[in-house]
């Protein structure tokens, strides 16, 4: 089972709107992952800058990167996330916004936790960054455990930290809320 779990595909969903200033850094953080079995689905949400050109440059370097185009700007990240989940091929679904970055070992450390049959969602603490992309030394602590009712009542998990197992959780759709995380 361990060999199987460590080779399972992770689909990373990245909504993008006018992200030319930072999408390259977000994609680079995915490319640096020590866990190699992933696909990155970047969902373009009608940007007016050259975000798509930047993503296409990365696509030319790595076939695991896919660009999906949303015809019109939805004004919220829920619609692009839902589009990404719909096209995802992986058993595991992870989320990374185009203005966030991951540590290189993020997937390598989180995926083995799914070997416990009771684990359906994995998440962690995260550190905030300032506008210039520098670490702000402000850690947002996640609760050690989140119940189903807590998940229904509000977002206790930092979006960029969460991964869920589709086989255990089933279909997940984001409501059309206006907040990002």
Residue positions per predicted region:
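N-proximal low-complexity "stem/linker" segments adjacent to membrane-targeting elements
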Residues: 1-31
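A conserved acidic beta->alpha catalytic loop
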Residues: 44-53, 72-74, 97
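Glycine-rich, basic loop-to-helix element that forms the pyrophosphate-binding segment
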Residues: 70-88
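Conserved nucleotide-sugar donor-binding catalytic segment
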Residues: 86, 124, 142-181
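The conserved acidic donor/metal-binding loop of glycosyltransferases
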Residues: 97-101, 125
């Amino acid at each position: 089972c361990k060999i199987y779990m460590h080779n399972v595909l992770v689909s990373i969903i990245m909504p993008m709107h006018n992200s030319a200033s930072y999408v390259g850094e977000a994609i680079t953080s995915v490319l640096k992952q020590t866990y190699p079995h992933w696909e990155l689905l970047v969902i373009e949400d009608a940007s007016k800058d050259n975000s798509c050109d930047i993503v296409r440059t990365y696509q030319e370097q790595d076939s695991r990167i896919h660009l999906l185009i949303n015809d019109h700007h939805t004004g919220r990240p829920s619609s692009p996330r839902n589009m990404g989940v719909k096209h995802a091929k992986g058993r595991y679904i992870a989320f990374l916004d185009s203005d966030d970055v991951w540590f290189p070992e993020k997937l390598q450390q989180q995926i083995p936790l799914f070997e416990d049959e009771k684990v359906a969602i994995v998440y962690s603490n995260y550190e905030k960054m300032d506008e210039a992309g520098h670490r702000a030394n402000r850690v947002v602590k996640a609760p050690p455990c989140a119940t189903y009712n807590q998940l229904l009542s509000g977002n206790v998990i930092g979006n960029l930290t969460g991964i869920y197992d589709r086989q255990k959780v089933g279909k997940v759709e984001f409501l059309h809320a206006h907040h990002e995380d």
